[in-house]
Amino acid sequence: MVPINTTTGTPQHTRVAGALGAKDSSVRLQAALAVGSNPDPGLLETLVERCAVEPDFFVRDMLSWALARLSPEITLPRIRQELDSEHAQARGQALHTLSKIGDRRAWDWITRDLLRDTDDEVARTAWRVAVALVPEDEKKNLVDDLVAQLGRGGRDVRLSLSRALVDLGSVIEPALEKAAANLDPTVAAHARATELLLRYPEAGFDVAIDEAKRVVTLGPERAAAAATAAVAARVAGSPETAATMESTGSTGSTEAAEIADC
């Protein structure tokens, strides 16, 4: 555990720091709640330091909430420093805290290095924050950075990336169309699944990726038509049409599933 510096704080600050570092996670959670309920700028450093080492998800989330309750004028500069930390949790939690604060001044801090962070959890958080803060005239550049990572990671990572892209809206369509023709079948399937989610968000990621994998070996034109028709049929609740589309794509389904497995 990273030690917390309490030498310059008041006795109350020392007690709070002790509670935030207690062995019992419920004690730490209550302490973070108390700090957030009574914002104290003197505890800024303690909260930031705890974010970097706190093992419990719910406590970390409460710590970020407590930081968001402080004035952004003092909080943002300190959080910005954490984005360059060598510790992945510190970077990720700093990004999460920025999402809670929601101050668009932080957009410039969401660098390409963060969007492509080697730690999946950091990258996923960076995608979410970037989509929330991006100015309108920067959306295309953000789309390019996100689309470049299609096919990355397992199901949860790919779902996060698809959600981030879909949240940007129709601006993603040209880049996805290009990525859907990628020679890497994993990238192509992920791009097609994201296209389908944009058109039919109610279909869900698993349905979209299943259809994308099913038709990825049929060729660009037939694949796009088959995937769109199959998902549309499922959304419309037409089992006959869906069955027809499943039959159409059956010849390539096994190979597609192997090469585009999520």
Features from the language model and the residues they span:
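Conserved hydrophobic register position within alpha-solenoid helical repeats
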Residues: A31, L63, A94, A126, ...
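Eukaryotic acidic, Ser/Thr-rich intrinsically disordered low-complexity regions
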Residues: E177-V235, E258-C262
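Short inter-helical turns and helix N-cap capping residues of alpha-solenoid HEAT/ARM repeat scaffolds
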Residues: K23-D24, P55-D56, E86-A88, T118-D119, ...
